[in-house]
A protein has these predicted regions:
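Acidic, Ser/Thr- and proline-rich intrinsically disordered linker/docking segments
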Residues: 1-15, 19-60
């Protein structure tokens, strides 16, 4: 299992399994929400493109 580390907007480290990411959405102001399911969302200080690139996922 592989994990990618992010820092959320509160400065806490978040480790995400890229295979569990459901969606990535721009919040504005260079912030992005990453969802790993029902109640598992967090906000990072990255653009959506940067977050997806960090996850190593191809975009179509």
């Amino acid at each position: 299992m592989e994990f990618v580390m992010f820092e959320d907007v509160q400065g806490q480290e978040i480790y995400v399994n890229p295979e569990q990411v459901v969606w990535v959405r721009e919040l504005g102001d260079k912030r992005t929400i990453i969802s790993c399911g029902h109640d598992h969302t967090f906000t990072v200080r990255l653009s959506p493109a940067q977050a997806v690139a960090a996850l190593g996922v191809k975009v179509r």
